[in-house]
Amino acid sequence: MIVDVRTYRVRPGKMPQELDLYAKRGLAPQTRHLGPPLAYLHRESGDINTLVHLWVFEDAADRASKRAAMMADPEWQTYLKLADEAGFLVDQRNSLMVPASFAPIKR
């Protein structure tokens, strides 16, 4: 099992609009291909303009296959275009992580 930890910085003051756009246009196609996220969070303290999503995959090949299918989905491409035009996101980072043997998530 791997966990894809994706961190996005949102323009100050644009978090509500970013969450609304994703909920209306991005959530359905993304979860259709990747399954539900382990978590979809936004910070309440510190760098408050930050979103973090966690997606679980069997392995790197599973992640690559599912993400390729998502990228080929016209509905996801429409969301990406709208997100780019809106310009709410400043940057993104991702890390592939492996849970410790004692982590409370199923491996």
PLM segments and residue spans:
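Surface-exposed interaction/gating patches
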Residues: 1-19, 28-29, 37, 99-107
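Solvent-exposed, flexible loop/coil residues
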Residues: 52, 92-93, 101, 106
